[in-house]
Amino acid sequence: MYKADITMYDCPVEALSNILGKKWVGQIIWGIQDKKMRFGELQRALDGCSKKMLMQQLDLLIDNNIIINDKKTVNNIVESTYYLSESGLLLLPFMDKMINWSNSYLLC
């Protein structure tokens, strides 16, 4: 059994599709890639994504060990920096292949 979000799946492809298919998730993962980003930077990069939606999707990605939230306290203020975990980095070549396939076979 494979757990994605709060649902259990028999098929690993279905479990991963459940996560990657959620609104903004692909753009969040692809947008971070090889850099660390603060919440505000992510929100500005995702034009049209509400603060609430971004928080929900980041929580989903953190819970599924795709993104890491590095929290540091600076002058009594907690600063969160988000970046891809090892497993998140391993998704990038897969997502690149999905982009190439989509560009070749899906009508836009």
Language-model features, listed with the residues they occupy:
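A basic, often C-terminal nucleic-acid-binding module that engages the phosphate backbone, implemented
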Residues: I68, E79-S87, L92
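N-terminal helix-turn-helix DNA-binding core of bacterial DNA-binding proteins
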Residues: C11-M53, K72-Y82
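Amphipathic alpha-helical dimerization/coiled-coil segments
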Residues: M8, W30, E86-C108
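Long, low-complexity, charged/polar intrinsically disordered regions in eukaryotic proteins
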Residues: M1-Y2
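A short, conserved structural fragment
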Residues: I62-K72
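Basic amphipathic alpha-helical segments that dock to polyanions
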Residues: L54, L58-L61
